[in-house]
Amino acid sequence: MPPKKDVPVKKPAGPSISKPAAKPAAAGAPPAKTKAEPAVPQAPQKTQEPPVDLSKVVIEFNKDQLEEFKEAFELFDRVGDGKILYSQCGDVMRALGQNPTNAEVLKVLGNPKSDELKSRRVDFETFLPMLQAVAKNRGQGTYEDYLEGFRVFDKEGNGKVMGAELRHVLTTLGEKMTEEEVETVLAGHEDSNGCINYEAFLKHILSV
């Protein structure tokens, strides 16, 4: 009898081990998600503004300005062949009275790679449209530029600014406006609390 008790060997447990093998299929799904996740944050980093089409830029500088610009340009020419490095373009633009951001400089250069900035060179004739594009761009603030400026005064973060505060800014900062001009501009934009929805105000001003 004792040997018969040994007959029911607990080997059936072997097939139960094979059952977990079916689980890897379910476990395989999560890794697929983790692979997709890292790709998402990389996308925003690659977003760049399209380069400026320099062939369409019209040079508006006068003769005196062109002579002055060329003299300044030549000061940055370290080789003596009438060219400067891409990496120097931003410095030359700033020396000529412009104040472009690094992103704006890269945009007019055609969004070059970091190694190209240190190796590629440009002559004055090619640089001039870049300078003109930057000068024109800085003279024309975009909706986002102005919106960012208004947000500084939006202390409540509700999309509104006090009309009195805006009047003070318009009459004392930048290109100062007269009180009459300010009243004309703000007419109809203040609510019962003396506040102004600056997004609607901006859209109205920029559409005029």
UniProtKB/Swiss-Prot annotation:
Positions of the EF-hand domain: 64-99, 141-176, 176-208
Protein known as: Myosin light chain 6B
Keywords from the named record: Motor protein, Muscle protein, Myosin, Repeat
A GO CC term assigned to this protein in UniProt: extracellular exosome
Assembly and interaction partners: Myosin is a hexamer of 2 heavy chains and 4 light chains.
PANTHER family, per database record: MYOSIN LIGHT CHAIN 1, 3 (PTHR23048), MYOSIN LIGHT CHAIN 6B (PTHR23048:SF5)
Annotated InterPro entries: CALM/Myosin/TropC-like, EF-hand-dom_pair, EF_hand_dom
Region annotated Disordered, chain positions: 1-51
UniProt-recorded Gene Ontology molecular function terms: calcium ion binding; cytoskeletal motor activity; structural constituent of muscle
Gene3D superfamilies: EF-hand
Main function: Regulatory light chain of myosin. Does not bind calcium.
Record-level GO BP terms: muscle contraction; muscle filament sliding; skeletal muscle tissue development
Coiled coil: none
UniProt biased composition (Low complexity): 10-40
